[in-house]
Amino acid sequence: MIPGKYRSVSGRAANNVNCGLHLVIQTSSLPEKNKVEFKLNKDTSSFPGRLLQHDLERNYSSRQGDHINLVSSSLSSFPILQRSSEEKILYSDRLSLERQKLTVCPIINGEDHLRLLNFQHNFITRIQNISNLQKLISLDLYDNQIEEISGLSTLRCLRVLLLGKNRIKKISNLENLKSLDVLDLHGNQITKIENINHLCELRVLNLARNFLSHVDNLNGLDSLTELNLRHNQITFVRDVDNLPCLQHLFLSFNNISSFDSVSCLADSSSLSDITFDGNPIAQESWYKHTVLQNMMQLRQLDMKRITEEERRMASVLAKKEEEKKRESHKQSLLKEKKRLTINNVARQWDLQQQRVANIATNEDRKDSDSPQDPCQIDGSTLSAFPEETGPLDSGLNNALQGLSVIDTYLVEVDGDTLSLYGSGALESLDRNWSVQTAGMITTVSFTFIEFDEIVQVLPKLKIKFPNSLHLKFKETNLVMLQQFNALAQLRRIDQLTIDPQGNPVVNFTLWKYYVLFRLSHFSMQKINGTEVTQNDMIMAERLFGILAHVASSELPQYRLISILGDARKKQFRYLLESKGKKPGIINEENNDSKRLVGENTNRATLNYTTRDFYNEKLEEIKEKKKFCKTYIEDLVKEATEINMKNEALQKLWPQMFIELVRDAVIEIRNKNSYMKLCLQQITDQK
C-alpha cells in the first residue's frame, strides 16, 4: 500500500473543485495580446487515494483539477507549463496532467517545490524535463508508451515510481533512487529482474503481467515486504529466502509445476501470505499440504486464511508423503544397486568365459598332438572336460581383481520368484530361510552361473524350497543334453525355461523332446512357455526310448543297483525276479507294472557327472593307478631280492655245511673242555 503521505488529495475539497484547463499556444515572441488562447472547462472527478496492492493492475494517480497553461514555443519542441499564482498556492506540492494527450513531458518551470507529479493516461514515450524537480517524492507515469527508464538520476528524494502499463523491456537507470519505497512496473515487457539490488529501502515491487520466466537476483532488497509477480511465465523462484522482511508474495497465474522449483520459499521465515492459484502446481492433490508442511509460518494461502485443522491434516499427509518418498528412494537405490551388481556379475562372467575359451583352445592344441581316448567312469562314457591348469592371463587377472571390490553376486526375492546372479549367490541356499518365504517360492532363476555348480546345490534346493515348480536358466553354459539328466533328482518340475543366451543346447532341434523323455516322471506342463501336449510325450518316447534301454543293458547288475535310489531298489529286485518267470505265469497287470518300473529304471541309468566330479574321478583313478604301480613294483623288487638270496644260498650252502660240521667236530673233540665251556656259558647266563 502506498503510504498515506503519497496519496492524492481526497475528501470534499477535491470533489468541489471546478477548474478550467487553459491551453495557450504561443507561435512567436509577440506581445501578450497576440496570443491565441483555447479554454476547456470541465469538472474533474476526485481520486481519493490509490492502493498499490498485490493485484496492482490499476495504478496510483491523482485527479485534482488544475488551471494549467501549456505554451508551445518556436524555440523549443516541448510545451511549457504555466500555472497561476492562485493555483500554485492551492496545489503547491502536486501537479496532475492526467489524460492530456501528451506525447512528451512539458517543461515545468518555477515548480521546484513539487512533491507529487501525475502523467497518467497520456502518450509519453520518454521521461524528460523533470530533472529540476529534485524534491519530487511521487512520480506517476501509468499508461503511457515509455520504452526505457531514463531521466531520473537527479530525483534522489523519489519514493514512489509508478511506471505500470508501458513498453519497458529492461529495468535500468535506477542507481540514484536509493530512497525508492514503491516501484510499480506491471504491464510492461520485462524479461529479467536486474539492477535493483541497491534499493535497500524498497518495500513494494510490482512486476505483474510481464514476461519473466524465472525469479532471482533479489539480493539487497532488505526492506521488501510485498512482491507481486502475477501473470508472468515463471517456472522457478530463487533468492526469495534472502529477503528478510518479505511478507506477501503473489505468484498467481504462472508456470510453476513443482514445489522443488520454489523450494527456497521454505527457508523464508518472514513470509506469511502467498498465492499459487492459476499454476499447474495448484491442480495437484498434494499441493496444499506440501506447501503448508514446508512453510509453517504461512497465515494465508491463495487469499484464504489457514486453519489449525488444515495445518494438522497437512502435517499428517506430509509425513505419509515423506515415508512414501523415502520408500521410493530406497527402491530406486536398490534398483540401481541391482543394476550395477548384475552388470558387474555379467562382466565377470564374460571374463570367465573368455578365460575358459582360451584354456580350451590350448587344450585342443595339445589334444591334436597327443590324442586321448575317452575315459570310462562307472560304465558311462563321458566327454572329457578341459582341466583349468593353465596360468590366467595377466590382463584378465587384473580385471578380475579390479571387479572384486564390488558385489559379485545378487540374491533377490520378488514375489514368488527367487533370482540368483553369480556363483556366489548359490551360498544363499545354506541360509536359514523362514518357512513362510521358503514356502512362497515357486520359481527359481539362475543367471551367470555354471550349470555344473548348480547341479551341486540341487539337493539343497529340493529341501529348502519344496514348492518350487519352475526353473529358469540364463547364461548357465548348458551345452549338451546329458546335463538335463541332473534335474531328475528334484522333487517336481512343472515348467522349465532355457534362455538361448548363454545356453547353446537350445540350438539342438530335439532338446525339448529329450527333456520330456528324461524328466517324464515330472509330467511337465510347459517348456519355454509352450504347453506340452500328449503328442510331444509320444514323440519323445519314440526318439529316445531305445537310448535308455541300451544304457541300462550295458551296465552290470551291481552298477544298476548302486545307481538306483533306496526307494526303487525293491522295485528293481522285483523286476529281476520276474525275468526268470515264464511269460504265461505273469498276468496282464504284472506286465503293465513291470513295464512302468522298467521305464523308470532305464531312465535312471541316464545320469550326469559334473566336470568337478569328473576331475575328481580322474584324480582318483590316477592315484589308484599310481598306488597299484608302486605296490606292484615293490612286490616285484622284494620277490627279486628273495630269489637272488635263495640262489646265493644254494651256491654257498655246501661249503657252509662242511664248515659247520667241521667247527662242531673240533669243538667237541675234547669232551672235558667242551663240558667246562658249556657249564661256564650257563653260569654266565645266570
Swiss-Prot record:
Residue ranges of every copy of the LRRCT domain listed in the record: 279-317
Biological source species: Homo sapiens (Human)
Gene coding for it: LRRC49
LRR repeat spans: 113-134, 135-156, 157-178, 179-200, 201-222, 223-244, 245-266
Gene Ontology CC: centriolar satellite; cytoplasm; microtubule
Name of the protein in its database record: Leucine-rich repeat-containing protein 49
Residue ranges of the region described as Disordered: 360-388
Chief subcellular location: cytoplasm
Alphabetical UniProt keywords: Coiled coil, Cytoplasm, Cytoskeleton, Leucine-rich repeat, Microtubule, Repeat
